[in-house]
């Protein structure tokens, strides 16, 4: 199951990195309202401020994540081959460098993705925050219809679901750690009865 989850995640990262279904999108602020256009020149012509190439940032996150997810495999193969060919010190060094790249690179990727996705331009491009004129139950459909070529709904939705899953996993992990700590404390205080070692 873990391998299936890894391969599925890697496949979606590759799809969104190399064949992203969302079109080019530039975010800009015009008179206090966010808007999306396919080119930066359109925003400059309209006098927009806070101009950001949202699509390129989202694609960069997927590309970074794709290679970040492949790094454990590539690092393991490189370390294994160098060890197999009689240079175990180099294999150990490659394994250590790969582990450092996996840990540090993964943390930076995770943080940058949150910043890019949940800043105002990312939330607007993904349809989380829409102009005041789009109200009611179908505001996302109205948003997608208003920006048919530039909305980042698909990429933004994938990123939001990914972060929701990781936050839930972090919460469960913290909860289990606290529960284990409490059980250990209770056992240390009350668990030592007669005949215990």
Which residues fall in each region the model found?
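Eukaryotic polytopic
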Residues: 1-197
